[in-house]
Curated annotation (Swiss-Prot), chain A:
Molecular function GO labels: GTP binding; GTPase activity
Organism field: Homo sapiens
The enzyme's E.C. designation: 3.6.5.2
Binding-site positions, Mg(2+): 23, 41, 64
Protein known as: Ras-related protein Rab-30
Written domain comment of the UniProt record: Switch I, switch II and the interswitch regions are characteristic of Rab GTPases and mediate the interactions with Rab downstream effectors. The switch regions undergo conformational changes upon nucleotide binding which drive interaction with specific sets of effector proteins, with most effectors only binding to GTP-bound Rab.
Length: 203, 654
């Protein structure tokens, strides 16, 4: 059990309208790439990046919507057990901003209350086409009690910052939690993932 | 809708129940372009699970169904040339009948809010109209996010249980749900009560003068409605069953978490008892005598490899399993346990079926825990969605709330060419998979369905108290009179994430002979007592109390052969709704069979590449010219370690 070389593992989930740059943010962060003209994401369930924060290894498991946001059909199970949500809109697309309350409703219903939500306005490289002012977004995020950041996956602006800040917050939340519930070891029979490894045999 | 659907696919799948979802994943996994649609606003069809308000909306929808006017459908004129004809699909779902709701929990606290609630209901239509998000989703959602954090007083005794959460499996940070449990939101209540005058008449009046301490009222349930994930079907996963194997093989298991069923119970002579089933259980049992322990172990050991000892049962081939058990020198106690709780069969079942069932039970024991069963955290309704996610990851396109008018069939070849949706859009494909509730009356005129009787109860205690109040139990109640059906009872605790703290969610299932209430009420009365009745009673109630109950009949189309449907083109494949059985074997088998019929040379749900092993083409070079390739090509770097997918388990105790 100690073979894993990380101190923390977090599940981060991206949501927001199609085309706002969710996959680009993930690819920029995990691989340093910006893929132009890229449409769907085939066969990629989640991406992993391990970062070091204050000497601690933090493994980030970053999940993308797999295109299910396109027709508003994200499965509930996508939200389950996420530690953080990155709610993304496109600063050059008013519509993607106007849909945020709908996404928040989904979060309310399916995500854990403990989830940390970050609001991200992407595509600041296209500032001349901006439709959503920074002030509006700030007001909205404040009202909804979210962190807020503007990014450019293309220019790599604030992308690292987004994920690293999030990792820091997740670590401090995790610390608080372990302090509060000092007995943090799961009880037998608690929820478990199944795989060949978890099997034991009769007798 | 902002975007319209693409119009060319290889496979169009209508319905998001378990078999359709498995098929979707399987097809998309082989590179087929899959469109997966559902006319409903939620995943799963009759396999779905709902929050409390979601369930109330579901009830309402069926109650209103009859007076909904036929939607004006876009004319198909012009979409279908002379050489083609249409096979219409059904407009309304007719698989659910005889819905009855009873509320026993006190509603007294709600009276003041009522005016506001009705007002709140009025508010809804406009917000629903302005968004494509379903009213089901918005029904229990807070208006303002902040209100989420308003304090809400809970009964005093819940605090020490806060460490009972599920380990997430992927993180060593325990996610505490403590806070969530305390948060209520007033808006939740509103939509629901307004719409439920029908049920109100069933409400058992409660004395307002009662001590409020520890009482769970209807408004508690409504406020905590999000905590509920109430399944329409009640099933468990056999730990050596087909579904578990498929989940593991396809890696879909990574999207879900499971809990062991902790107890097998029996109901005998008016009493609920725990059945010892593992070796350790048998030896530790206080109920069994030493002699009984030996008899039971001897018999169970024989069942594990009964095929090797035909002489033990050959002479009894004519007997039923229960008659056979009598000849094995087992006490009545043990006979009951084996027949009803281990083999879970009817008394009349044949000796071979009984032995087979006993063997299956024993084989499943101990793979993941002390009983042969697993239950998905957040409910069975998660499972179809997990397969849908897998389909989407491999490019499948998802669209809920999308109604289909008809199939379009080429007159000459007799093959289905396309579907036409409610916008009048034509969507072409090679293969069509449809859940049978979508087929029209005309198509199904020769089909005779069985029915399943279901009850969903919210109760305040377990049917069998134990040291831990977090038990998941299954109980088979034998029929009171011969010829009637046994009733399967599953009791879920709050740590399964299917009900609020301090309550239990109880599912009853049997094959129908009458309406669900007529079939199941007697068992409900044997095990539970209505909430209000015992409140006037000074004595400590021995039976758990009923807070809320729902009865309904669900159509069981599992046994229908393809040839019973009229005039379906050969490239239209039919999936059935849920069957009444305990496991999910029927759905998995059906999906696999259909898949092999459609794609005989393809592997069924092979494991996907490990996400941590994926490297992208072009990782080390600058991305290609815009527009040349819309798909990220993934390849597997086999040199990397391949065990990381298992990392979630590494945090689990063994």
């Amino acid at each position: 059990m100690s073979m894993e070389d990380y101190d923390f593992l977090f599940k981060i989930v991206l949501i927001g309208n199609a085309g706002v740059g969710k996959t680009c943010l993930v690819r920029r962060f995990t691989q340093g790439l910006f893929p132009p003209g890229q449409g769907a994401t085939i066969g990629v369930d989640f991406m992993i990046k391990t970062v070091e924060i204050n000497g601690e290894k933090v493994k980030l498991q970053i999940w993308d919507t797999a295109g299910q946001e396109r027709f508003r059909s994200i499965t509930q199970s996508y939200y389950r057990s996420a530690n953080a949500l990155i709610l993304t809109y496109d600063i050059t697309c008013e519509e993607s901003f106007r849909c945020l309350p709908e996404w928040l409703r989904e979060i309310e219903q399916y995500a854990s209350n403990k989830v940390i939500t970050v609001l991200v306005g992407n595509k600041i490289d296209l500032a001349e086409r901006r439709e959503v002012s920074q002030q509006r977004a700030e007001e909205f995020s404040e009202a909804q009690d979210m962190y807020y950041l503007e990014t450019s996956a293309k220019e790599s602006d604030n992308v690292e910052k987004l994920f690293l800040d999030l990792a820091c917050r997740l670590i401090s939340e995790a610390r608080q939690n372990t302090l509060v519930n000092n007995v943090s070891s799961p009880l037998p029979g608690e929820g478990k993932s199944i795989s060949y490894l978890t099997c034991c045999n009769f007798n | 809708m902002a975007e319209s659907l693409p119009t060319e696919f290889d496979v169009v799948i209508i319905g998001t129940g378990l078999p359709e979802s498995i098929l979707a994943a399987a097809c998309s996994r082989t590179g087929q372009r899959v469109l997966h649609i559902d006319s409903r606003s939620y995943y799963g069809g009759n396999w779905a699970s709902f929050s409390f308000s979601g369930l109330l909306s579901w009830v309402k929808e069926y109650q209103q169904d009859s007076d909904i006017e036929e939607e004006s459908t876009v004319s198909r004129q012009g979409l279908i040339p002379e050489t083609e004809e249409a096979i219409a699909l059904r407009k309304k779902d007719e698989t659910i009948q005889h819905i009855e709701v009873f509320c026993y929990a006190s509603q007294d606290q709600d009276t003041e809010d009522n005016v506001e609630e009705i007002g709140a209901l009025q508010r809804n239509p406009s917000s629903v109209a302005s968004t494509t998000i379903t009213e089901l989703d918005s029904a229990c959602l807070p208006e303002e996010r902040q209100s989420y954090f308003t304090d809400y007083e809970m009964p005093a005794n819940h605090t020490q249980k806060s460490d009972k959460e599920i380990s997430l499996g992927i993180t060593d940070v325990e996610e505490s749900l403590e806070k969530e449990k305390d948060c209520g939101d007033n808006t939740c209540i509103h939509t629901i009560l307004g719409g439920h005058k029908d049920e109100d008449k069933h409400t058992v009046e409660d004395n307002t003068g009662q001590a409020k301490k520890n009482r769970i009222t209807f408004s508690h349930i409504v406020k905590e409605g999000r905590r509920f994930n109430i399944d329409l079907v009640s099933k468990l996963l056999y730990s050596q069953g087909l579904l578990i194997d498929l989940l593991i093989k396809s890696n879909v298991s990574r999207y879900a978490e499971f809990k062991n069923v902790t107890r097998i119970l029996a109901f005998r002579e008016g009493k609920v008892e725990q059945v010892p089933c593992s070796r350790a259980d048998v030896f530790n049992s206080k109920e069994l005598t030493m002699v009984e322990k030996r008899m039971l172990m001897k018999f169970l050991t024989f069942c594990l490899d009964y095929e090797q000892h035909p002489d033990e049962y050959q002479g009894f081939r004519q007997c039923s399993f229960s008659e056979y058990l009598k000849t094995k020198k087992l006490t009545p106690n043990l006979q009951h346990f084996i027949l009803h709780s281990i083999a879970m069969t009817e008394s009349s079942c044949t000796i071979i079926d009984g032995l087979k069932a006993t063997k299956k039970f024993l084989q499943c024991l101990g793979r993941f825990g002390n009983t042969p069963f697993l239950f998905p955290v957040y409910g069975q309704g998660e499972i179809p969605q997990c397969f849908c996610r897998m389909c989407a990851v491999f490019g499948g396109i998802y669209c809920l709330r999308h109604k289909i008018q008809c199939f379009v069939v080429d007159k000459e070849s007799g093959r289905c060419k396309a579907i036409i949706d409610h916008f009048g859009q034509r969507i072409n494909a090679k293969y069509f998979i449809v859940e049978d509730s979508y087929l029209s009356e005309e198509t199904c005129s020769n089909v005779h369905y069985k029915q399943i009787s279901r009850a969903v109860l919210i109760t305040d205690q377990s049917v069998l108290k134990a040291d831990s109040d977090q038990q998941i139990s299954i109980l088979l109640v034998p029929p009171a009179e011969p010829g009637a059906c046994a009733v399967r009872v599953t009791e879920l605790c709050s740590s399964t994430m299917t009900c609020m703290k301090d309550t239990y969610l109880v599912h009853l299932t049997c094959s129908s002979s009458k309406t669900a209430r007529e079939d199941l009420e007697s068992v409900v009365n044997k095990l539970f007592t209505p909430y209000a009745e015992t409140e006037t009673n000074k004595e400590e109630p021995t039976k758990p109390r009923l807070l809320w109950a729902l009865y309904f009949n669900m159509r069981d189309s599992s046994g229908i052969s393809r040839s019973s449907y009229n005039g379906l083109p050969s490239n239209v494949y039919v999936c059935s709704g849920p069957d009444g059985g305990l496991g999910n074997e029927h759905a998995v088998k059906q999906a696999e069979t259909l898949f092999q019929e459609i794609f005989p040379s393809e592997e069924f749900c092979p494991p996907p590449p490990n996400p941590e092993d994926i490297i992208f083409d072009g990782d080390d070079k600058q991305p290609e010219v815009p527009g040349t390739n819309n798909i990220i090509m993934a390849t597997i770097d086999s040199s990397e370690e391949s065990k990381n997918l298992e990392s979630p388990e590494k945090h689990l105790p063994h």
